[in-house]
Design a protein with these regions (language model features):
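N-terminal accessory scaffold of Fe(II)-dependent oxygenases
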Residues: 2-300, 308-357
Length: 357
């Protein structure tokens, strides 16, 4: 029993309400179910979208030609000389908080102190798919552990959002689909954006949430999602930091950090799956840990809007990196959104831990 919890298990004060809420939600959604084959739209809407519950759907897109065709060589040949956008980082972490210790930071004013921490986004480079594949498949030794990240080999990741499949990869659209029919029929609309993702085990997406219903289809490799429901944003250690981006010296191969001008503060999560597991051991009265979901080739994950997620990936048994297509459907800004906003604002005032703003 926590200090603020009554003998009957009910919350006794405002702060303890948040622990109680997490416990209630995790009892309702303790795991992510798996269903075989594309569900009927009414079933998908009733059991998962309306219930705000993630689900893995297996064998939902076996008819895609991509399931047979997509290899790195095929993608490179299909795209030819077309330039694509590739996000490049020194450590695989794009859109993340970064300590500036040991980094060369540019963009500070004459009288401005270098910030201790920044919110950094990847460097975006234009290259052909073949050049991306060559960079991705260049062997990387194990002797970089003691080297500062600014001097490590670049980690490329095809991860541009807001409709990258249709905008940058039109030659690949015929290999998959412009929508997931069961999801479009259930939600009564086409997806707002369809994105292509290609990366290996070095790339990591830090905890965040989206205001989209997300249907994430894995064609090759494995995607590993760590999920938290909307009520658990309080645990993610949000901090504000100035916005910045990675820059690199192509000749010397070193990375630096460039601050945005004018200055812009971004609130972002600092927690990791490992830090949340550690916290659960040291705070046993509030032992929240993420739900871990592996999504393999031929499977898709429905990730409800506003659920927090951290994503990594792995190669398959043939050594092919993770290749995926995801569909973003605009969420309905209904009472669920209002409840999530209320919880967020209440915790910011009474909870004692950081929360997204």
């Amino acid at each position: 029993m926590s200090d603020g919890e009554a003998d009957n298990g009910e919350p006794a004060d405002a702060r303890d309400l948040f622990t109680w809420l997490s416990r209630e939600v995790h009892e309702l959604v303790s795991h992510v179910p798996r269903v075989h084959g594309a569900p009927r739209p009414i079933q998908f809407l009733r059991e998962f979208v309306s219930a705000n519950r993630p689900v893995v759907v297996t064998d939902a897109f076996n008819d895609w030609p991509a399931m047979e065709r997509w290899s790195l060589d095929y993608l490179a040949d299909a795209m030819g000389d077309t330039k694509i956008s590739v996000n490049v980082t020194p450590d695989g972490r794009g859109d993340a908080l970064l300590s500036t210790r040991g980094w060369t930071v540019s963009g500070t004013g004459d009288d401005e102190k270098t910030p201790d921490e920044v919110f950094v986004v990847p460097e975006e480079r234009k290259m052909t798919m073949r050049e991306f594949v060559d960079m991705l498949e260049t062997p990387v030794g194990d002797d970089h552990g003691d080297v500062h990240p600014s001097h490590r080999p670049p980690v490329p990741y095809v991860s541009r959002q807001c409709g990258s499949l249709l905008e940058e990869f039109p030659k690949l659209v015929g290999d998959c689909s412009h929508e997931m029919r069961f999801a479009s029929d259930a939600m009564g609309k086409a997806p707002d954006a369809v994105n292509l993702w290609i990366g290996d085990e070095r790339s990591e997406t830090t905890f965040h949430r989206d205001h989209y219903e997300n249907v994430y289809c894995v064609v090759r490799g494995v995607k590993v999602f760590h999920l938290l429901p909307p009520c658990d944003g309080r645990l993610l250690g949000y901090r504000e930091a100035p916005a910045a981006k990675f820059t690199s010296s192509r000749e010397g191969g070193t990375f630096g950090v460039e601050l945005e001008t004018p200055r812009r503060l971004v609130s972002w999560a600092s927690a990791t799956p490992a830090s949340l597991r550690s916290r659960a051991c040291t705070v046993p009265e509030d032992p929240v840990v993420p739900i871990v979901v592996e999504v393999r080739a031929g499977e898709c994950l429905y990730l409800p809007a506003m659920w927090y997620h951290h994503v990594t990936q792995a190669r398959d048994e043939r050594g092919t990196p993770a290749i995926a297509v995801n569909y973003w459907y605009d969420m309905n800004f209904d009472d669920r959104y209002a409840y999530a906003r209320f919880t967020q604002e209440a915790h910011a005032r009474f909870g004692g831990e950081s929360t997204p703003r």
